[in-house]
Amino acid sequence: MRTWEIPHANLIFSFCQSQEQLGKKAVFFEECLPALKSRMDLDVVNMFVIAGGTLALPILAFVASFLLWPSALIKIYYWYWRRTLGMQVCYVYHEDYQFCYSFRGRPGHKPSILMLHGFSAHKDMWLSVVKFLPKNLHLVCVDMPGHEGTTRSSLDDLSIDGQVKRIHQFVECLKLNKKPFHLIGTSMGGHVAGVYAAYYPSDVCSLSLVCPAGLQYSTDNQFIQRLKELQDSAAIEKIPLIPSTPEEMSEMLQLCSYVRFKVPQQILQGLVDVRIPHNNFYRKLFLEIVSEKSRYSLHQNMDKIKVPTQIIWGKQDQVLDVSGADMLAKSIANCQVELLENCGHSVVMERPRKTAKLIVDFLASVHNTSNNKKLD
């Protein structure tokens, strides 16, 4: 069994950092306020009162959104960051099947980059990494089958093979494989990306797998043991990766992240509110990808991966054991491994700058090697 990413974690990290800064500012104002009050002229006070009245409505609207509709605030957050980073949202169709994706840039002399997110996440989980990637790269982040804006159908094949076929349809629709592209996937997305590279070698010029699922370990870690117990007891409503309360959401965040932080109840509630309408689908998907058909698809196909491959893994991953990196390195001929200290399963969220740098450096080394071969 395996698992995936913390959805919305970049929002949480940003919030916690801002809270720390606000705390320092609050101490400063608390110390200085008596002096300010004694010196402030009544007219100046009145001016601030009038200005405060002018700002009251938007401030109240923000506070109301935070307290009453935190899920709306989360959606606004992603809209804002997509806009800031220049990521445009588009749709493309294969027959009657809709794919939703975001992109930046246009295909050029450098390989395009296709990014596949993890279980129960969406294309926007990559924004924290996109922020640190060069703007001259052509980036494409797609919603995986059944997620966010991509079609969700009860007839869809949600197995790893089924998802690989859907991603290939997406690639064909965009003509992304007109020239081999660089493929990146994390967790479940890493599982799909690895199998894709094995099935469609001519599409891919290089591969980055970030703590991918789909490997068979000799011993199960504590988390996998717990999942097996839940599966044996048919208690699928208790899967830790599918929270339905703020408390369960907090537990999932602690499981997937090495960083420990306290998230406000309103944010936790907002994250749960966003997920609850989709939880039945997540349960169906989860059971499909841990089934006998899909469970070890990457393991069964890793020796078929022939392109230069990069493995990135957090050393403190509690979900998928870091020893998986060594397994892949032994089976893939042209493979380099990057292990990150003080990092859990959510590598993309915990270490976005480092992840982006590793990817850019890897692409540069692969590109230089291929150029040297052409000269020879």
Question: Residue spans of the language-model regions?
Answer:
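Active-site loop/oxyanion-hole signature of alpha/beta-hydrolase fold enzymes
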Residues: 140-184, 200, 357
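Alpha/beta-hydrolase fold catalytic core
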Residues: 15-16, 23, 28-113, 135-137, ...
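Conserved HGGG/HGGXW glycine-rich cap/lid loop of the alpha/beta-hydrolase fold
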Residues: 103-149
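Conserved alpha/beta-hydrolase catalytic His-Asp/Glu region
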Residues: 70-72, 218-225, 239-306
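Gly/Ala-rich beta-loop-alpha elbow adjacent to hydrolase catalytic centers
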Residues: 185, 189, 193
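Catalytic active-site module of serine/aspartate enzymes centered on a nucleophile-bearing elbow/loop
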Residues: 32, 42, 335-376
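Short beta-strand/loop motif that positions the catalytic acidic residue
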Residues: 305, 311-313, 317
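Flexible "cap/lid" loop of the alpha/beta hydrolase fold
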Residues: 198-199, 203-244
